[in-house]
Amino acid sequence: MKPGIHPDYKKVVFMDTSTGFKFLSGSTKTSNETIEWEDGNTYPLIKVEISSDSHPFYTGKQKLADAGGRVDRFKKKYNLK
């Protein structure tokens, strides 16, 4: 890699704000907030709104969209049977 053109890649802690779940990962993202991790080191803290701990795909609490309601409204709008 060419020196001086790539951002610094370092360890950061990501925190899911909806569940409080935290995980340590590598990233180029930076933050003014820091947190002390389980290993005793201090890392930058990145707050995210959704992660694998709260996303419906990973939690199994998926909500299926009801397409039948849209079809019924279309039929009613155009007087179809």
From Swiss-Prot:
The keyword Ribosomal protein applies. One of its GO terms (cellular component) is ribosome. The keyword Ribonucleoprotein applies. GO terms for biological process: translation. Keywords: Ribonucleoprotein, Ribosomal protein. One of its GO terms (molecular function) is structural constituent of ribosome. Part of the 50S ribosomal subunit. Belongs to the bacterial ribosomal protein bL31 family. Type B subfamily. This is Large ribosomal subunit protein bL31B. It comes from Halalkalibacterium halodurans (strain ATCC BAA-125 / DSM 18197 / FERM 7344 / JCM 9153 / C-125). The gene is rpmE2.
